[in-house]
Amino acid sequence: MKTRFNTFDIICGVAELQKLVGWRVNQIYDVDNKTYLFRMQGTGAVEKVTLLIESGTRFHTTRFEWPKNMAPSGFSMKLRKHLKNKRLEKVQQMGSDRIVDFQFGTGDAAYHVILELYDRGNVILTDYELTTLYILRPHTEGENLRFAMREKYPVERAKQPTKELELEALVKLLENARNGDYLRQILTPNLDCGPAVIEHVLLSHGLDNHVIKKETTEETPEAEDKPEKGGKKQRKKQQNTKLEQKPFDMVNDLPILQQAVKDAQELIAEGNSGKSKGYIIQVKEEKPTENGTVEFFFRNIEFHPYLFIQFKNFEKATFESFMEAVDEFYSTQESQKIDMKTLQQEREALKKLSNVKNDHAKRLEELTKVQDVDRKKAELITSNQSLVDNAIRAVQSAIASQLSWPDIHELVKEAQANGDAVASSIKQLKLETNHISLMLSDPYDNDEDDDLKDPEVTVVDVDLALSAWANARRYYDMKRSAAQKEKKTVDASQKALKSAERKTQQTLKEVRTISNIVKARKVFWFEKFYWFISSENYLVIGGRDAQQNELIVKRYMRPKDIYVHAEIQGASSVIIQNPTGEEIPPKTLLEAGSMAISYSVAWDAKVVTNSYWVTSDQVSKTAPTGEYLATGSFMIRGKKNFLPSCHLTMGLSLLFKLEDSFIERHLGERKVRSLEDDQIDPNVKENEVEHDLLSDNEDADSNINLSEPSSNTEITAFPNTEVKIEHDTGRIIVRSDSVNPEIEETKESEVVLDKILKKTDDEETTIILAGPSRKKQVSAKKTKEDKARAKQEAAKQEVPPVSSEPKNPSQVKRGQKGKLKKMKQKYKDQDDEEREIRMMILKSSGKEKPQASADKVVEKSESTKEYVKPEKSAAPKNPVELDDADEVPVGGDVDVLNSLTGQPHEGDELLFAIPVVAPYQALQNYKFKVKLTPGTGKRGKAAKLALNIFAKEKSCSAREKDLLKSIKEESLARNIPGKVKLSAPQLQKYHK
């Protein structure tokens, strides 16, 4: 099977890529450490083309969507830095070698990407002087040639084009060839066209098996021994072609060879024109079928830009361009592997069935043969009754005379020497078993030809204790016993064969089903995240780590979407996609909150905490002046809507992909139910109580002490919130839900998290404030707010306008509180809260930019605020990969969600099954489900047990069982939060 480009492929590929000259690099991605994608865009053109290069293997344009790494590699970042928005100026082959040079930009701003397509391959990024800026595989060749950064790329190392072979050069080449060399071996290193072209032109002119034969015979043994050094494969090839070798005639064959060389050069010129079609050479593989009909599967083996004559008897697929053929060849490699694996499994299953049939047939044949032999022996004893009786009596007489066994042997030999007929019929004495072997023939089988040939003799064992008739009867009994055994064997064989055939057909069915499911299985974009579909048909996604948290907020969160987060550090960022723009029902909010809590450190800690939701416009990556938001960190502005506490209960279930014609039967399975909304709304919106109903004694639970250890300055109100996502570390500050609400209201006024985690210069400080979501007394809160606000205002020497700030902040002086309260009343409509918070963080006296006014006034409702004070010189470690050119789904694709059901009906056409981990309340109506709670069990073991439970369900149909078999345990376990306890009805019977 062809795996990489040859010289002629490179010639045609470079010529075809000339159409991309002048296009700009839009973006660069890496598929793996050897394969890179260049997203190209023409000037003023809407169309985009993706150029794929793979070190040591290939380069071509592609229309397929290749998987890209979540974060770009270091090499990709280097390529982006130097090549992004650069114009592709030149694509050329270096000399006649398998090296391609892509030039981006011109003059001193030019950069080269050099792709090596031989040996282990390489990709080198150089500047305009070909000085290496970055190299994929640094190495050395010999003592002087070094491939590394800041080394100049050796252009002279590339193989230079050979001169056109004239008649004299061709004759000299043939004269210098060794005796026994094939013409293709001589021409390949001397023509810049590759072995496929040379084989084509030689076959076209009838010179494919011509070898050089010289008159001297001294070198013949050496020539014959030479292929032995090439290994087993070369020796086998030599043996196969040895009989077809033809000597090359320098007189008659030389003009033909010269014409063949010209044809090869014409093919190269045709390839340089860039008008090559593409061909994929295929092999027809016969597929075994259940009903005996013949089916075929076409396996791709090679790709070429020209239909060579050596492939005229092969199946082929034709394409308009060579790039299309290469793209199709490599893009279908995975499905071809699946088909070949399926074919191999089918063949193995049928081979086992064939072996069973052959074994049974062999056993029946042996039983039939035994019957024939026993019957024949019985007939021979009957036909030679007197002879058999005489032999038995003679031996019995010798035994009765008390002769020793050696004496009896000597007696028989003497009788045979004397020509005794009875003694001559004795073949062997088996006195240890009381038997003798007689040589018997049919006395009635006397034809005219008997005088010319000896009669057929059969050796028959005779029991000395029985007469001739009794021995004959014994053989007849043995024959009947064998016949009965044969009958039983036939009956058993039929049952065994039916069972084997049934198992084989079942195996074939399973193999084909799994193969079809794997090929039909569409991996949806949201499966790379934590995800589930809510009870009301909203798609909910969450990030697995900081990079994915960044990704879903930047790429997938749209206006009207809801951002959900747990009131705990290290939780996943959860997005509820809202394509309709309508208000998200409370039940979906609760389920998303449960997901956010479960995918956090709360799961392993087995603690219950709160979650909250905000709208998408409240989430921002805009950091305070002078600060940096690390990957996965966001600023949340305004009020947070807290959700009721929920249990750490998740569920594992299956969603089935429906065929389009069956989707309508399942519409409305996940719809909004108003009664449930009415029941849940009071709990969900308990934070939205009007402020005039709050008492004066409400606890200022959101107060934060941001002063130095020696300062008593307090800051109140509702500061902007930055959620720092760290899955590995983090301090958990939660409120216990087991406390009596009345007692808790009293305690919560005292449990105000006003401590600050001390921050060093090289350590990021995170402040997570977890507060209650219940009603508080207003007076206490207002008192504290006024006091804290007064102290903040006292830190200024003069009353600032909205866009100004104090130059010399100081502590509040005695006697200024009354004046500051008047100032506060005067400037109460100004939203300077964010400016004050930033000033306190930065300890800066510089001026800030004006803040937004009326649209960003923060309500004084209960909410918990978080603030992360990152490192002074923080920098992103792993930038998140954002594909700006990719089409981003706007909200959940409703059609896709409607095509997935957890409640398959009888008669539905199910295409494949997708495992889903979701809050258990979202799975109440699903057919297959198990409950997951924090425990000590491993995720893989729990997933395996869940599959076993689903497969053994009485209501599980045959198709559903087939789909279950195609699900891998790792895909089932990857979304389980952590150590887990699995719960299901009658769980004990599934444990082995």
Curated annotation (Swiss-Prot):
Deletion consequences: Mutant flies are viable and fertile. Shows small, developmental delays and shortened lifespans. Shows dysfunctional intestinal barrier with increased number of intestinal stem cells (ISC) and enteroblasts (EB). Results in enterocytes (EC) with fragmented mitochondria and defective depolarization. Results in aberrant activation of JAK-STAT signaling pathway. Shows hypersensitization to ionizing irradiation with melanotic masses, defective S phase checkpoint and decreased cell death by apoptosis. In neuroblasts, pros protein does not show relocalization to the nucleus.
Major localization listed first in the record, in broad terms: nucleus
Protein's UniProt keywords contain Protein biosynthesis: no
Region Disordered, annotated ranges: 214-245, 688-715, 771-895
UniProt xrefs under Pfam families: NFACT-C (PF11923), NFACT-R_1 (PF05670), NFACT_N (PF05833)
Expression induction or repression: Up-regulated in response to DNA-damage induced by ionizing radiation.
Keywords on record: Coiled coil, Cytoplasm, Membrane, Mitochondrion, Mitochondrion outer membrane, Nucleus
Keyword 4Fe-4S annotated: no
A Gene Ontology biological process term: CAT tailing
Cell compartment(s), UniProt: Nucleus; Cytoplasm; Mitochondrion outer membrane
Biased composition (Basic and acidic residues): 214-231, 782-796, 845-874
Bilayer topology: Peripheral membrane protein
One annotated GO molecular function: ribosomal large subunit binding
Record field: transmembrane: none
GO cellular component, as recorded: cytoplasmic side of mitochondrial outer membrane; nucleus; RQC complex
Biased composition annotated in UniProt, kind: Polar residues: 702-715
Family of this protein: Belongs to the NEMF family.
Function: Key component of the ribosome quality control complex (RQC), a ribosome-associated complex that mediates the extraction of incompletely synthesized nascent chains from stalled ribosomes as well as their ubiquitin-mediated proteasomal degradation. Thereby, frees 60S subunit ribosomes from the stalled translation complex and prevents the accumulation of nascent polypeptide chains that are potentially toxic for the cell. Within the RQC complex, Clbn/NEMF specifically binds stalled 60S ribosomal subunits by recognizing an exposed, nascent chain-conjugated tRNA moiety.
Subunit structure and binding partners: Component of the ribosome quality control complex (RQC), composed of at least the E3 ubiquitin ligase l(3)76BDr/LTN1 and Clbn/NEMF associated with the 60S ribosomal subunit. The complex probably also contains TCF25 as well as TER94/VCP and its ubiquitin-binding cofactors. Interacts (via its C-terminus) with pros (via its homeobox). Interacts (via its N-terminus) with emb.
Domain characteristics, as noted in the entry: The N-terminal domain contains a nuclear export signal. The C-terminal domain may interact with cargo proteins.
Name this protein carries in UniProt: Ribosome quality control complex subunit NEMF homolog
UniProt organism field: Drosophila melanogaster
Gene: Clbn
